Structures are given as structure tokens and as C-alpha cells.
């Protein structure tokens, strides 16, 4: 971390630099479909409008973790602390030897040429965050315009929203064009029943809109039971994987920004996977086929 460039927030939990080796061996070609890079701040400064200042988490550290956990590829999601400055993201993709794709954050002012540059760099989608403690949420007409402009590129939307806000936003989400992927199952309240009103609404949204996918990631953010097993999250993620096996993905969320209760062991997060995707077929769809279809379709469609 460059102290001269910035100072990470007091109380910030830094990522585990010595994660365990997972007991679960992921299938060949597995993809970590949700991870981030932060800075380094002295090279890629954090946005002046950021709501938090993290520790540095470099591309080299991310790629080392990928290899340690047994994954082959990564989908790097633009962190809100970098705003719409995607340089750290693009740099990481450029140094991945073709093993990474990206999800950018863009403003309404972005030009068509700039979108094409991001596409050439390996970006395949745009993230919209509706979590007010992390971002200033943009007006719906701005988001709709961006969503429409990325369709010719074949990009998709990534939606970060929390379950309590879903009732007010579901109609808007259903109006947006193209494929969209919800982060972390829209962050359900795992103290409620898996067939309760709140989670059922999310499941109905997926059932009614075949263009909607979700990541069954971040048990560490949702749990009250705690690590390493995250038993209270398992029923929710398992239900989603079983009902929507072709529209689910998984990711580490490394380096786990804004955690307050604990810092997860990434090896133990991988061991969560066979508890929610209980067969070889479900595991392959979750970790290989589904993210390949979305991020490397040119390889998936031409594969054996």
C-alpha cells in the first residue's frame, strides 16, 4: 500500500494473505465470476467521490489467488471506489493472458468510441449499483440509456441491489433490455424462510424473466451463523442453483471490500460450492459453462 497516495479507512479489514487450500477441487476450466482489483492507489488513484478507501489489492495478488484456488479464469468487476475510471480494471485484463474479462462502470457521457475501446480491452458488461451507502444512485433514465447503448456490443448488466429495495425496483429491472446478472442473490435476509415472501419475490423475478441471472456468491456477507460453513446461507443458494441451473454463477468477491464481521478464508469459500451445487453437472454449469457462455461465448460456442 502506498501511504503517500492514500490512507485506507480506519478499521478496514484487509484480505487474508494466506488462504487455505480448498478441500473441494473445482472442475477444469473453472471461472471466478466475481472479483475485484483495488489500485494500487499510487498508480490508479481512487475516485474523489468514493464512499470508502480500501487497501490495495493488485492484479498480481488476484491472479496468484486464482491459481491457488484452482481456477483458470476471472471476471473482474469494477469496484465502486474507482468510480467510472476503469483503468485498473483494463490493466488487469491486459495482463491476464486472456484469462480475464471485465465488468465496467460507465457514465452517461461515455462516447461510442470509448465503449468500443472497453469492448476491445475485454469488458463485457456494465455494473449498476443501487446500494446507497456505496454510491450515489443514478436516475433511472440515465441507467436505461446506458443499458440500451451497450446492447449492440452484446454486453450485459450486472445489478447490485439489496433485498429490501427489490420491491420498489423490480418493475424497473424488468423494463431494462438484454441480459442482467444480480450480484449475491440480491442480498437476501437469511434470517427469513427460504420460501418466505421476500426471497420468493426474487425467485419469481428470475422465473418471470429468462434474461435474468444471479451469482450465488458472498455467503460471508449474508451470514449470521458465521464462518467457515455459512450454514444459514446454504439453503438459499442451493435453491437458486437447483431451480435455475443455467443462469447461476459463483465468485469469491476477493478482496472482500467493506467486510465488518470477519474476513473470509477464500479456501473455505470454495468449500461452500459443493454444498450448494451438489452434483458434478451442477458444479460444471455454475463454474464453467454458464460464465463461459456469458464471457467467452466465442470459445464456448466453438468448443468440442
Language-model region placement:
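Conserved, mostly hydrophobic/aromatic
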Residues: 34, 66, 89, 118, ...
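Hydrophobic alpha-helical segments and helix pairs
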Residues: 111-160
